[in-house]
Amino acid sequence: MSSEDAKKLKNPVPFTKKSIAQGRTTFQRFCTGCHGADGKAQVDVVADATDLTSPNLYKSGTSDGEIFRSVRDGAGETMPPFQTQITNETDLWHLVNFIHSLWPESMRPPLKDQ
């Protein structure tokens, strides 16, 4: 998927506490080894792992679709693709929502269930 196509993707899963919790489960299973439990990156494991709490450091874009593409297809030289491990697209979208929840509050989308 091209970066332009990724930018056009819209997350069909609302940004809710339930979605964030479901995304957290996927994150804990597949992502903490490189990004750490807090999302701040395990640079002692992967030197160029992205600190997911700082969107300004993202190299492959910060839109929902760009994050989705980075997880599904991989990004850069060290972020592997997870399309064969996370095969359900809804689970990927929940993960995108969880990643957004790691951002500073002023940068997060508004919760839909408040």
State the predicted function of each range:
Residues 46-51, 70-103, 107-114:
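Axial heme c-ligation environment in periplasmic c-type cytochrome domains
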Residues 30, 38, 56, 74-75, ...:
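Conserved functional loop/turn residues at catalytic and ligand-binding sites
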